[in-house]
A protein has these predicted regions:
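A surface-exposed partner-binding patch
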Residues: 1-64, 103
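Short catalytic/ligand-binding loop motif for oxyanion handling, primarily in non-cytosolic enzymes
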Residues: 62-65, 82-84
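Short acidic-glycine loop/turn motifs at beta-strand connectors
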Residues: 67-70
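Compact, glycine/acidic-enriched structural inserts
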Residues: 76, 81-103
Length: 103
């Protein structure tokens, strides 16, 4: 899957790759860019949640994925399937706006 351009720009920036969010799910940890494709293969996302593509996690058993509509969703790593996907944001830009900034 081609990652959204705004997400790729974020990955290549000096902005935080982990930290707090202003609301649920409260924490994010973006996977290293060079590991995203393999991580999706390892968790068999195409088999269990077709149309989704993982890019991060919460450190507690849920991952964040881009959905078929370009939105950002939370999916459990155990019991992963499209019907349990929780919408978090309509786009990466909206998700990014939930990252708590310090200083």
């Amino acid at each position: 899957m081609k990652l959204p351009d705004d997400f790729v720009a974020y990955l290549q920036s000096e902005l935080p790759k982990c930290g707090e969010l202003s609301d649920f799910p409260l924490w994010f940890e973006i996977w290293p860019e060079e590991e995203i494709e393999q991580a999706n293969k390892d968790i068999q996302i195409e088999q269990y949640a077709p149309g989704f593509y993982g890019f991060a996690g919460d450190g507690a058993g849920e991952m964040y994925a881009f959905g078929p509509d370009g939105g950002v969703y939370a999916l459990p790593l155990i019991g992963m399937e499209p019907k349990v996907a929780k919408p978090l944001a309509a786009s990466w830009t909206e998700f990014q706006s939930k990252i708590v900034k310090y200083g």
